[in-house]
Amino acid sequence: YWEKLAMDGIVLMELGEYPWSKKYGWVRDQFGVTWQIYLGEKQGDQKIVPTLMFIHENNGKAQKAMDLYTSIFPNSKISGILKYGEGVGNETHEIPENIQHAAFKLDGYTFFCMDNSYNHQFDFNEGISMVVMTDDQEETDHLWNSLIANGGRESMCGWLKDPFGFSWQIVPKKLL
């Protein structure tokens, strides 16, 4: 995977050994999507794990986001949290209470998230979104209203941004 993703992309962290993984690398592919490849504990059968990095004005909000997401989706829970103050590596510039790495499940699917204070040249935008297929109007309304509450905003055609600026598409199955 690494060679193909790195081709015509930008390596953000070389593929190699780090304190948290015997094999890890971070790359931005030719389309601007970043990928973290690592050898770690198997997360069930899910090979690709969406990872949200809370940066800029959202740095320090990963916990709030996980709390929101796990409260509105069924079969959801926070699986583990590692804060910078108790973590590995030399992240002395980070706020100790912020999340270095966390795992959570939404409707049975694994997600990771983290806070980071670096001045990254990217942020959440519509280029990446989560698509949620709903069974009925009640589920659609519940997810929509929960995700736009407290600072989220509606967009067009079933799109919205949650209070953290992350994009979601809420799509009733009967429309497909």
Where are these regions (language model features)?
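Short, structured active-site "lid" loops
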Residues: 95-108
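Short, structured interface segments
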Residues: 24-42
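Acidic pyrophosphate-coordinating catalytic loop
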Residues: 88-97, 121
